[in-house]
């Protein structure tokens, strides 16, 4: 008995679905390559995974040239009478598809750089992604280092300016202290000069001591009051030669 027809439907198991996709994709790419080699045919194959991952094969040197050839054959046949408006619409649609594919590719690349959707990637693609991350890290470190150096130079310039301002203030304080000392010294010198002038003036003028009795030729000796008789004798003796 032969095998019955297998119903084609979506594989529910995620792991089995990814494994089946990888096997069928590789087989399809292999068949396209064999067809191009064996039959000398120009073959172009484009596959998008359910996560938006692009897989392609082109037997010619450029996928874009093959697509342009396809577009010319499909939309630009001589027997087809296409108006200018329709041609513009087709051109706009083609440009939109290109931009959409580019946008989706950038989104996939961004998710891969963030560590997402890495399951469909093979070893070469992972190595390429790793190199991109290494280059990004080097650029980030270089930018951060340059930023730190610029900040350090700015701080050094500010430090130099503050040191100059501090040196100027110290110099002004020293000049002010010197002037203050000179002023105090001058004030002391002026005070000493006034005292010396007063002392010299006092030497010219002596106070007169008023004696109650004018005694000519009498030496002013202390008188000891002992009695009436000695006092008179002493007084008279002062007048005798």
UniProtKB/Swiss-Prot annotation:
GO CC annotation terms, alphabetical: nucleus
SMART domains: MADS
A GO biological-process term: positive regulation of transcription by RNA polymerase II
Domain of life, per lineage: Eukaryota
Subcellular location: Nucleus
Domain K-box, residue spans: 89-179
Keywords: DNA-binding, Nucleus, Transcription, Transcription regulation
InterPro entries: MADS-box/MEF2_TF, MEF2-like_N, TF_Kbox, TF_MADSbox, TF_MADSbox_sf
Residue intervals of the MADS-box domain: 3-57
Pfam families recorded: K-box, SRF-TF
GO-annotated molecular function: DNA-binding transcription factor activity; protein dimerization activity; RNA polymerase II transcription regulatory region sequence-specific DNA binding
Main location: nucleus
Stated role: Probable transcription factor.
PANTHER family named among the record's database cross-references: SERUM RESPONSE FACTOR HOMOLOG
Stated name of the protein: Agamous-like MADS-box protein AGL9 homolog
Gene name per UniProt: FBP2
């Amino acid at each position: 008995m032969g095998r019955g027809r297998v119903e084609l439907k979506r594989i529910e198991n995620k792991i089995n679905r990814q494994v089946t996709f990888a096997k069928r994709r590789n087989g399809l790419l292999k068949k396209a390559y064999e067809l191009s080699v064996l039959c000398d045919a120009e073959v172009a194959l484009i596959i998008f995974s359910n996560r938006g991952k692009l897989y392609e094969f082109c037997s010619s040197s450029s996928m874009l040239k093959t697509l342009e050839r396809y577009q010319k054959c499909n939309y630009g046949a001589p027997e087809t009478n296409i108006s200018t408006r329709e041609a513009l619409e087709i051109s706009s649609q083609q440009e939109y598809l290109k931009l959409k594919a580019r946008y989706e590719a950038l989104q996939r690349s961004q998710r891969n750089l963030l560590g997402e959707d890495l399951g469909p990637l093979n070893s070469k693609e992972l190595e390429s992604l790793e190199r991109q991350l290494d280059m990004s890290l080097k650029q980030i470190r270089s930018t951060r280092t340059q930023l730190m150096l610029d900040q350090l130079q700015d701080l050094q310039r500010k430090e130099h300016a503050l040191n100059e301002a501090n040196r100027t203030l110290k110099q002004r304080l020293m000049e002010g202290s010197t002037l203050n000392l000179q002023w105090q010294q001058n004030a002391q010198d002026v005070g000493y000069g006034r005292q010396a002038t007063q002392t010299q003036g006092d030497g010219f003028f002596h106070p007169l001591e008023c004696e109650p009795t004018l005694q000519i030729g009498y030496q002013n000796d202390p008188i000891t009051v002992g009695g009436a008789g000695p006092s008179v004798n002493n007084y008279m003796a002062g007048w005798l030669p």
